[in-house]
Amino acid sequence: MARKKNTKRKVKKNVPLGIAHIHTTFNNTIVTITDLNGNAVTWSSAGALGFKGSRKSTPFAAQLAAEAVAKAAMEHGMVKVETFITGPGPGREAAIRSLQAAGLEITAIKDVTAVPHNGCRPPKPPRG
């Protein structure tokens, strides 16, 4: 007889409050929604939605990533979200707006971008 495979089923958690972590770089935007303990509920990124190359860094890609995450989080029963934004990317505002437009209530917006006390040398600017 064939052995039954041990597969993990996705458990639908009922999480009414959560934290939305928006990580924007110059190349991509990653949106993760966690519960209050920091356990990931859902995540998405511009690259995961099929955007490639320079299209990943657009505000539109960030908007779609945030919409996808918001819909998935609302399936888990999420209503209110606190937002932490990291990074200098172009998708910052677009991601927040689309979270709000999708129906999640944003209770707080915090910018938690790490600022060096003159640590590593930044990359040289591109020359046109």
From Swiss-Prot:
One of its GO terms (molecular function) is structural constituent of ribosome. One of its GO terms (biological process) is translation. GO terms for cellular component: ribonucleoprotein complex; ribosome. Pfam families: Ribosomal_S11. Keywords: Ribonucleoprotein, Ribosomal protein, RNA-binding, rRNA-binding. Located on the platform of the 30S subunit, it bridges several disparate RNA helices of the 16S rRNA. Forms part of the Shine-Dalgarno cleft in the 70S ribosome. Part of the 30S ribosomal subunit. Interacts with proteins S7 and S18. Binds to IF-3. Belongs to the universal ribosomal protein uS11 family. This is Small ribosomal subunit protein uS11. It comes from Aster yellows witches'-broom phytoplasma (strain AYWB). The lineage of its organism: Bacteria, Bacillati, Mycoplasmatota, Mollicutes, Acholeplasmatales.
